[in-house]
Amino acid sequence: MSSKLVLVLNCGSSSLKFAIIDAVNGDEYLSGLAECFHLPEARIKWKMDGSKQEAALGAGAAHSEALNFIVNTILAQKPELSAQLTAIGHRIVHGGEKYTSSVVIDESVIQGIKDSASFAPLHNPAHLIGIAEALKSFPQLKDKNVAVFDTAFHQTMPEESYLYALPYSLYKEHGVRRYGAHGTSHFYVTQEAAKMLNKPVEELNIITCHLGNGGSVSAIRNGKCVDTSMGLTPLEGLVMGTRSGDIDPAIIFHLHDTLGMSVDQINKMLTKESGLLGLTEVTSDCRYVEDNYATKEDAKRAMDVYCHRLAKYIGSYTALMDGRLDAVVFTGGIGENAAMVRELSLGKLGVLGFEVDHERNLAARFGKSGFINKEGTRPAVVIPTNEELVIAQDASRLTA
């Protein structure tokens, strides 16, 4: 066990993902999830030394109770883990324009996260609770907490990518612009793709597709992000599990004026009742859509719209590659496992030289990386993401 152990925290509004990772070699000593916060069935599950365990946190439990449990129950089983922690890394969904890289957390950073909360109202307030609880639970690491921003990697976008064609004052005075998300994942797979393609990162032109319950595509030119599909918030872009992605903005006025829906109802519909869930009217789970594609109309409908949108984004981002596209990369829960999504999407892009090898595509699932294109055609590659490792490495580097 090295002396570079980092506790990685990802606090959501109703859950907390946690892990202890060796920032040098990536070994994971503890991983877990506390979920169903504020509900009677609040629970925590974890894996340590290869064994999986689970416990109830008590009705209504939330971040504070979860961190208490991690410190006083889980880590009490293995005190040497606590003793060797050198830093705590926090995933922060939105850093606005202020943060272009990870930073050690102090009062000004806490204020910066608060200032960006209007762009991520479900996430940033939860991150702040996580930071406050971590400072309480690990007083010996009070100056070793690091914020790693999902938006940071996208801060290299040029103005023509991040500006909306709205009154310019909305950007200058209120920060209304494209920020993107999943930046830590897009950054990680960019580094890994450079190794697999045997190219220096700064010469790499790729399109990265992080596809999970949320999804985004990024255009990476010379190793830097030049455009991404998520916008001011994570609602723009691709079809997602429950999010609509791109729509005609006037649909909102139509729903309000014609159907009498309130702003809150429309917001809920676009974020929680749309996407794959809206199209199937059954589930947000891509596995259902893939498994039933050939037999159920709802699954086929959802898959076709999903892949159509994804292919359009990949195709449009080739225009930003300065005439050279080295590869398309798939990552995230769907990107890594849904072979059908990859095959159908790239099947629409034959004009760009993509041809999927069926066997290679099926082999690159369940944590396995690999090229999925036919020999001699444009590279397409699957790379399992590892956001926790990036967070651990940044936390370790900044607190060394």
UniProtKB/Swiss-Prot annotation:
Intracellular or extracellular location(s): Cytoplasm
UniProt cross-references to InterPro entries, sorted A to Z: Ac/propionate_kinase, Aliphatic_acid_kin_short-chain, Aliphatic_acid_kinase_CS, ATPase_NBD
Family: Belongs to the acetokinase family.
Family matches, as Pfam families: Acetate_kinase (PF00871)
Record function comment: Catalyzes the formation of acetyl phosphate from acetate and ATP. Can also catalyze the reverse reaction. Has broad substrate specificity and can also utilize GTP, UTP and CTP. Can also phosphorylate propionate, but has very low activity with formate and is inactive with butyrate.
Biological processes per GO annotation: acetate metabolic process; acetyl-CoA biosynthetic process
Alphabetized Gene3D superfamilies for the sequence: 3.30.420.40
Residues binding substrate, per UniProt: 91
Metabolic or biological pathway, per its Swiss-Prot or TrEMBL entry: Metabolic intermediate biosynthesis; acetyl-CoA biosynthesis; acetyl-CoA from acetate: step 1/2
Domain of life, source organism: Bacteria
Cofactor(s), by name: Mg(2+); Mn(2+)
Swiss-Prot/TrEMBL keywords: ATP-binding, Cytoplasm, Kinase, Magnesium, Metal-binding, Nucleotide-binding, Transferase
Comment on bound cofactor: Mg(2+). Can also accept Mn(2+).
EC numbers, comma separated: 2.7.2.1
Keyword Cell membrane: no
Organism of origin: Salmonella typhimurium (strain LT2 / SGSC1412 / ATCC 700720)
Disruption-associated phenotype: Does not grow on ethanolamine and tetrathionate under anoxic conditions; complemented by acetate kinases EutQ.
Regulation: Inhibited by EDTA, butyrate and citrate.
UniProt-annotated binding residues for Mg(2+): 10, 387
Reaction catalysis annotation: acetate + ATP = acetyl phosphate + ADP
Record: residues binding ATP: 17, 210-214, 285-287, 333-337
Subunit field text: Homodimer.
Residues of the active site: 150 (proton donor/acceptor)
GO CC terms in record: cytosol
Gene Ontology molecular functions: acetate kinase activity; ATP binding; formate kinase activity; magnesium ion binding; propionate kinase activity
Gene that encodes the chain: ackA
Protein name: Acetate kinase AckA
